[in-house]
Amino acid sequence: METLQGLLLWLLLSMGGAQASREPLRPLCRPINATLAAEKEACPVCVTVNTTICAGYCPTMMRVLQAVLPPVPQVVCNYREVRFESIRLPGCPPGVDPMVSVPVALSCRCALCRRSTSDCGGPKDHPLTCDDPNLQASSSSKDPPPSPPSPSRLLEPAGTPFLPQ
């Protein structure tokens, strides 16, 4: 009887009854749709903009003997190529530049976190939504993403060149 049960178990397992998926468990680093908030202190309107950002999983390692060996540098999902699109904020008073630059991720990669261009974790200094929801206006022709993730933010002036690492 035990031989028969063992044979049946072997047969089920060998036919793919317990087969691992070839897909990664977490989505890897790639451009994804996201909604960002664009606002200026002097302008009375906050505009939400649909764009692409870099997000996803990057393989990392941690040393077992942390006290003896130096830490292993951790990589995060970073922009490889990015372009900036200018958005005009409506209702800005005269003398205030109504243009805001928004990043559009063209490609991404796993690399060391660059604080100059990425949100490396820790306290958030810029909200991902408008400060005052009553002032919110929408400015986008694309369909909104299914759910806004916690993105790396990359808001720089349009004239600032971006050089990939």
From Swiss-Prot:
<dbReference type="InterPro" id="IPR018245">
    <property type="entry name" value="Gonadotropin_bsu_CS"/>
</dbReference>
<feature type="signal peptide">
    <location>
        <begin position="1"/>
        <end position="20"/>
    </location>
</feature>
<dbReference type="Pfam" id="PF00007">
    <property type="entry name" value="Cys_knot"/>
</dbReference>
<feature type="glycosylation site" description="N-linked (GlcNAc...) asparagine">
    <location>
        <position position="33"/>
    </location>
</feature>
<feature type="disulfide bond">
    <location>
        <begin position="29"/>
        <end position="77"/>
    </location>
</feature>
<keyword id="KW-1015">Disulfide bond</keyword>
<keyword id="KW-0372">Hormone</keyword>
<feature type="disulfide bond">
    <location>
        <begin position="46"/>
        <end position="130"/>
    </location>
</feature>
<comment type="subunit">
    <text>Heterodimer of a common alpha chain and a unique beta chain which confers biological specificity to thyrotropin, lutropin, follitropin and gonadotropin.</text>
</comment>
<dbReference type="InterPro" id="IPR006208">
    <property type="entry name" value="Glyco_hormone_CN"/>
</dbReference>
<dbReference type="InterPro" id="IPR029034">
    <property type="entry name" value="Cystine-knot_cytokine"/>
</dbReference>
<comment type="similarity">
    <text>Belongs to the glycoprotein hormones subunit beta family.</text>
</comment>
<feature type="glycosylation site" description="N-linked (GlcNAc...) asparagine">
    <location>
        <position position="50"/>
    </location>
</feature>
<keyword id="KW-0732">Signal</keyword>
<keyword id="KW-0325">Glycoprotein</keyword>
<feature type="disulfide bond">
    <location>
        <begin position="43"/>
        <end position="92"/>
    </location>
</feature>
<dbReference type="GO" id="GO:0005179">
    <property type="term" value="F:hormone activity"/>
</dbReference>
<feature type="glycosylation site" description="O-linked (GalNAc...) serine">
    <location>
        <position position="147"/>
    </location>
</feature>
<protein>
    <recommendedName>
        <fullName>Choriogonadotropin subunit beta</fullName>
    </recommendedName>
</protein>
<dbReference type="GO" id="GO:0007186">
    <property type="term" value="P:G protein-coupled receptor signaling pathway"/>
</dbReference>
<comment type="function">
    <text>Stimulates the ovaries to synthesize the steroids that are essential for the maintenance of pregnancy.</text>
</comment>
<dbReference type="GO" id="GO:0005737">
    <property type="term" value="C:cytoplasm"/>
</dbReference>
<feature type="glycosylation site" description="O-linked (GalNAc...) serine">
    <location>
        <position position="141"/>
    </location>
</feature>
<feature type="disulfide bond">
    <location>
        <begin position="58"/>
        <end position="110"/>
    </location>
</feature>
<dbReference type="GO" id="GO:0005615">
    <property type="term" value="C:extracellular space"/>
</dbReference>
<feature type="disulfide bond">
    <location>
        <begin position="54"/>
        <end position="108"/>
    </location>
</feature>
<feature type="glycosylation site" description="O-linked (GalNAc...) serine">
    <location>
        <position position="152"/>
    </location>
</feature>
<feature type="disulfide bond">
    <location>
        <begin position="113"/>
        <end position="120"/>
    </location>
</feature>
<dbReference type="InterPro" id="IPR001545">
    <property type="entry name" value="Gonadotropin_bsu"/>
</dbReference>
<keyword id="KW-0964">Secreted</keyword>
<feature type="region of interest" description="Disordered">
    <location>
        <begin position="131"/>
        <end position="165"/>
    </location>
</feature>
